Amino acid sequence: MKNNFSFTAVLLLIITGFVSCRTNTESILPPSSVVSQIDIPRVTGMPDMPRPYVMKDWKKTAVDFDHYVYDFSQKGPFLPLIWIDTMKRNFLQNTYGIYTAIGDVREGPHVNDGENHEAIGALGSIIGATLVGIDKSEQDGNNYVAMVKNYFNKDNGWNIIMNFTGKKAHIGGGYGNDYWYDIYNNVLFYGVSHFYPNVEGIDSVQRAIADQFLASAHKLGSNYSYSFFDFSTMTPGKNHIPTQEDVAAGYAFVLYAAYIKYKDDKYLKGAEMALKALEAQKENRNYELFMPFGAYLAARLNAEAGGNYDVMKFLNWTFEGKSVNRDGWGIIVGNWGGYDVSGIYGSTKDKGGYGFAMNTFDLAWPLLPMVRYDQRYARSIGKWLLNAANASRLFYPYDIPDSLQALPGKKAITKNVIAYEGLVKEPDLKGHTGKSPFAQGDGPLWAPGMPDETMFSVYGSGHVGIFGGTIRTTDVEGILMLDCLATDMYRKENAFPTYLLYNPHKDKKSVTVPLGSSSVDLYDAVSQKFISKNLTGNSSVEIAPNQAVLLIFVPAKSKLSAENNQLKANGTIIDFNYKINK
């Protein structure tokens, strides 16, 4: 009896040891084939290393923007840039407004009872500030997160976030008549709510939005070919504004986030229905900002929900500049007047090219986390963002020569944290033709009496924290360390720190990566292998020329497992595309 027991015990120890060794970092089976990088065609036309190269301190810019714009004590012409709205629309509380542009005569505390202010500026600035470490729920005695609930239009029966608190305040920009404004502000609100889920009343607003979006999605089915949707009557409509089929990606984002938050499959089904409607389009319907969210949701649903969406289709529609409902809308590629401007987002045709600050900042929100779920696009996204981040400094009046901007003599009021609305190749402003690139804005055209200073875009500049919270420089010029988790909102599961680094140089580079004080094993999801182990402090990582790495900081000595095409460390997914032939 004793001999049999001893034999059994030894056998169990051997088996246990075998299983253990199969799950440690030394012996996990390699993938049957390593994923290959896929080039986004539009990105291949961009320089590997943009010139002249000057990387703006995006985090400092975002912090300084918040300190300037959210300062009620600022004095001088057109200041302060913020005020309190005491009209208590939709909720019995005060809210606040920030100017759309410096000096906007349509807005302010003494115009229309202080009600004229846009959600797109307030919500974007909260997300941006939060990404660089500022708590907007408790700042100088104000809870700005709670205050933006007033944009939830329940008084008119729509029960979604809208660009204004009510029809009385509609001064331009969309309000019930321009689809992207109504949908994107809900994407932004869900972004705010991701960071502040416990602020009073936020959850109930989120749930109401999700239910309205789901009802609307069922009403629309596979047809989003409308200019707007009346959420009070659940009726779509058309007007002089082009149809905007890409809003379906905005629906998908909100509904998938609601699915993760509330764990109710009806929202997942709604998200899938919306994304399939967009994927089924026969031509590029990229209108404003939703198509990159389509790429992000496609990658996530493929990785997390067994989908089979065409990620490249959404990426091409985002980048190629061949939209049919907004002619030429996409990513600009080129060198204007000796400046590489590739990567900025806007019209590839208007004025020879017109890239916008807000759109460019916001593009990083979905595209960076997308590579977590589909690392085949790591190199392309790294290259695009290097170009975009370099070119975007030219939106700022102190980062572009005076001769290449509309208002060099009036730039002091910007403190170089408020950018021009955009950058054009061929300006048509009197006295400035032939200058390229040229920083300007459309503010003076919005209404009679607008001062020149309305070229400086407060609403767009508030989104700069998306760059500030995701981009950091390294000890090698041109190699950025890009945070792929910062804007990966409503994650289904826990995740380890994940960074994308792209080497734009023609030779191999060794870059220093800060790891922190806890021991980690470095996994590269591009090569699909561990490249260093048991590290703390700083580590040197080699990157081949014109290649990228996607680094995951895995706790040292984690137990590994590979199943269902996923590689996990201590149960946390570190690779969504790890395929092993068994």
What function would you assign to each model-found segment?
Residues 444-517:
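Carbohydrate-binding surface patches
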Residues 535-581:
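C-terminal beta-strand-rich structural cap/linker in extracellular carbohydrate-active enzymes
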Residues 93-122, 164-184, 233-247, 278-291, ...:
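Solvent-exposed loop and edge beta-strand segments that line ligand/cofactor-binding
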Residues 45, 121-138, 183-201, 239-242, ...:
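Well-ordered alpha-helical scaffold segments within catalytic/enzyme domains
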Residues 17-20:
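C-terminal motif of bacterial Sec signal peptides marking the signal peptidase cleavage site
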Residues 213-230, 281-293, 297-445:
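Extended ligand-binding clefts on enzyme/binding-domain cores
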Residues 23-169, 198-227:
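Low-complexity, Ser/Thr/Pro/Gly-enriched N-terminal "stalk/linker" regions
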Residues 193-265, 273, 277-280, 296, ...:
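Active-site lining segments of carbohydrate-active enzymes
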